[in-house]
Amino acid sequence: DATQHWLIAEAPSPVGFAKYSYQQRMADDGKIGTLLHKLYLMPGKTGHRYGEHIFHAVETRAKTAGESWLWLEVLAANPAARRFYERQGMQHIRDTTFHSASQQSTLHILAKPI
């Protein structure tokens, strides 16, 4: 998909990645910005600031692309991830519910003007 971008961090081998898309509308409020779909670190690679570096690299790319917002959804069941994103300057906007045939999950929508 040409609208999705990937960033792979290496030090010297792969330590993690981010998947993000520009010009994505935050549901219900009309703001448009870069949606950070995923930020993932390999097992054993947390605690070395790799996540911060990957996050800030995505933020820099979004600014360079002319975006005004960086936003994401994080599972309510993952408070450590929410704390990480809040340390990066993200703020809680609202909650939404994800429904599938087999589950229902609360998602926190976090955003940051950039």
For the regions a language model picked out, list residue spans one by one:
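Acetyl-CoA-dependent GNAT
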Residues: 1-44, 52-57, 61, 95-98, ...
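C-terminal "cap" of GNAT-fold acetyltransferases
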Residues: 30-34, 68-82, 86-114
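Active-site acidic-Proline motif in GNAT/NAT acetyltransferases
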Residues: 42-44, 48, 76-77
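Short polybasic/polar patches that bind polyanions
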Residues: 46, 63, 86
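Short coil/turn segments at alpha/beta junctions that flank glycine-rich nucleotide-binding fingerprints
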Residues: 48, 65-68
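Short, solvent-exposed loop/helix junctions and linker helices
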Residues: 48-49, 104
